[in-house]
């Protein structure tokens, strides 16, 4: 009985960790450097910048720690 409870708790913990690893933050930035600073401050491992309209950039920060 105790081993089943421990296994269930481990499975729940692993699901929570996977969800946190895939956390995504978006923000509007002025340029790529601003985007890089924003993602770094959130503790993100990856970033992607895309230009929405000429002066505006959208920053996608991927795999962030909370």
Curated annotation (Swiss-Prot):
Expressed by the venom gland. GO terms for cellular component: extracellular region. Residues 1-21 form the signal peptide. It is found in: Secreted. Disulfide bonds join 29-49, 35-59, 39-61, 44-64. The keyword Coiled coil does not apply. GO terms for molecular function: potassium channel regulator activity; toxin activity. Belongs to the short scorpion toxin superfamily. Potassium channel inhibitor family. Blocks voltage-gated potassium channels. This is Potassium channel toxin alpha-KTx. It comes from Hoffmannihadrurus gertschi.
């Amino acid at each position: 009985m105790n081993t089943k409870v421990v296994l269930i708790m481990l499975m729940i913990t692993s699901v929570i960790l996977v969800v946190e690893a895939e956390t995504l933050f978006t923000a509007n930035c002025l340029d790529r450097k601003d985007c890089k600073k924003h993602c770094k401050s959130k503790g993100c491992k990856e970033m992607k910048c895309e230009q929405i309209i000429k002066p505006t950039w959208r920053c996608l920060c991927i795999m962030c720690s909370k």
